């Protein structure tokens, strides 16, 4: 049973996350030959203030992009 964990910043809708999980499931069915019922996907979301890239939190990066 393949288990996939997706770590990402918060902010996507439930519909977006469900679509992503469906697409990942189908990719595993196609490429690994497993049944969809065997695929487990978990999303771990972090607040934007708890994620950093390039020495700036995602909150800081978003604020800089608006300028």
From Swiss-Prot:
Gene3D superfamilies, per the entry: Macrophage Migration Inhibitory Factor
GO molecular function, one term: isomerase activity
Highest taxon in the source lineage: Bacteria
Enzyme class: isomerase
Residues of the active site: 2
Keyword Transmembrane helix: no
Family annotation (Pfam families): Tautomerase
Enzyme Commission number(s) from the entry: 5.3.2.-
UniProt keyword list: Isomerase
InterPro entries: 4-OT-like_dom, Tautomerase/MIF_sf
Protein family per UniProt: Belongs to the 4-oxalocrotonate tautomerase family.
Stated name of the protein: Probable tautomerase bsl7456
């Amino acid at each position: 049973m393949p288990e996939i964990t997706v770590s990402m910043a918060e902010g996507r809708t439930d519909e977006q996350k469900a679509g992503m999980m469906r697409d990942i499931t189908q990719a595993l069915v196609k490429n690994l030959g497993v049944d969809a019922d065997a695929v487990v996907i978990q999303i771990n979301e972090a607040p934007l203030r708890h994620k950093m890239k390039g020495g700036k939190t995602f909150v800081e990066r978003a604020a800089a992009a608006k300028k």
